[in-house]
Amino acid sequence: MERYVVTPHEGIGSLKLGMSPEEILAAVQNDVADLKIFSKRGIQISQTRERDANFQTLRYMEDIYFSMVRYQNGKAIEISVDRELRDEVKVSLYDLDVFHTPAEDVIRFMKQIGPCIHDEPDEQLSTEYEFPALGIRFWRERAFHEKLLLDRAYVEAMQLVLEEEKRYLYFDIVTVRP
């Protein structure tokens, strides 16, 4: 497998909206085998309990592979994959590598296709970006933008971890929903 394709309103790779947990697990197992990711533990699955019993969220983990699927009434309604895959497989949306392309460039490109909602007043320093018309959401743990380097107080305060902060120029997770 060379590429994990993100398809709006449909899915990511072989993980498709509308699949049951059993179908998703089979798809994850096939993808992990195709990626030649093996560990002694096998695929680990963890569940998040939700207040509404009609919903559940399952996380599928195997070494560098991590996906999260939210289900409603036993059918996938949201599928996410994590950036840890980026060195093994290209995760692409409209041929754009979503984990190797700076977040600012991803958002600029996606805004040509559909409107964007972000979680902070300063779009460049947001951590979550949603494109409702496309059923696509991007997330990063923290925001970082080169303009922060113009703030002397920020640079001094962040001196020890500044190189690490630059990883937040990129997204951590891409999600597909209906």
Model-assigned labels for residue ranges:
Residues L15-L35, F99-C116:
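Amphipathic alpha-helical segments
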Residues M1-G11, V32-V98, I113-P178:
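Amphipathic N-proximal alpha-helical interface segments
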